[in-house]
Amino acid sequence: MVSVSDIDSVQKAWGDGIVAIASAHSNGEDYVSIARNHVETLYAYGLTNVLFKPTLAAIEQFRPNFESALSYFVASNNECPEDKGFAIKGWTNVRFENADLILGDSTALAMGNYFFTTPEGDEVKVEYTFGYIVDSSGNLLSLIHI
């Protein structure tokens, strides 16, 4: 059974990943490798279909594969020309507030707001819905992100 603690952990990992990508980009480090790891370890690409609809995507609204998801975060591979690199905007913190959860044996849903802290210390509020699946190693991976 997926627990609240499992959801808290995967959400913390997701937020920490966004901050790590932003920090590496700001410091001239290999942010693309960090972003690749972020998508590889937190999304279910390669395991099942992933329903990813990034908030700021308007032309290429849906990201059904790994490369299109990576493009949204770092805009490094020219997969989706509209992308500007959401994760390289300098975010210094990400926090989640779940409105509600649905927990199952090998799946879970979470809906709420997450708050991205800008370099100036302002918070940007965005709504989310994540769907998760447990893989064969017991990892909780996102298969829905809208």
Give the residues covered by each predicted segment:
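Residue-level recognition of alpha-helical structural elements
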Residues: 3, 28-31, 122
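Short, flexible helix-adjacent loops and helix caps
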Residues: 22-26, 119
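Exposed beta-sheet edge and beta->alpha loop/turn motif
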Residues: 100-137
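Conserved small/polar residues in nucleotide/adenosyl-binding loops
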Residues: 144-146
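Sec-exported extracytoplasmic/periplasmic mature domains
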Residues: 19, 23, 44-47
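Short beta-strand segments enriched for Tyr within beta-sheet-rich domains
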Residues: 139-141
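A solvent-exposed, acidic/Ser-Thr-rich amphipathic alpha-helical stretch
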Residues: 12, 28-99
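Basic/polar N-terminal segments that are highly enriched at the extreme N-terminus
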Residues: 1-12, 16
